[in-house]
Amino acid sequence: MPSLQPGMPGAKEAYGISIIHDDLWFAIPPKAKVRYGIQEDDIVVLVTGHRGEGGFGLIKKDTALKTVFARFVDKIEGIEHVYWYDRKAYALTHVDNGKVQLTPELLQAFYLEPGSHLLAVKSTTVTISFTPVEIWKQKLAKHGFFEAIENMSKLEEF
C-alpha cells in the first residue's frame, strides 16, 4: 500500500481515491478490502470522522461489535438510516460487489455529495477513513507536506 510520504515514520498509508458516483455508490479499494477482511454482503458501519468535516470511517459491523463502537452499533435498528449519538452520525449499510450504496440522508450526514473524491487511508486497525481529498490537501499543506499532496495525484481512483 503506498505511503503518502515514503520513508517518513507515521506517514499515512493510502489505498486510493474512492469517488462517489452520481447514483450514490462508491467502491472500496481492493487492497483496503483485503487489509480489513471485508467480504461481499458484509454489513459495515459508517461513522462520522472529525465533527464538522466531511467523510466517514468504515468498519465491518462484526469488528465494530468487539470495540468501543459496540455501544452505538447495538442501538442501530435499520440499514441505510442515520442514527445520531453524541453528535456523531452512525449508519449501517452493506457491501455489494465491492461497492457501498449511499443515500441522500447519508451524504448529508457526512457532508458529501455526488462527485466527492475521498482519500481512503488506514485510520486504525479496524477503521478505513474516507475523507475528501480537499480536506487532506489543506491539512497537509498547513504542515508543509507538499510531497504527500503530490503523491495523492498518483493514487488509483475507484
Functional labels for PLM-detected ranges:
Residues 22-37, 94-111:
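Short beta-strand-centered segments at strand-helix junctions
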Residues 32-33, 50-53, 106, 124-127:
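Short, charged beta-turn/beta-strand-edge "cap" motif at the junction between a beta-strand
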Residues 1-17, 47-98, 127-158:
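Intrinsic disorder/low-complexity detector
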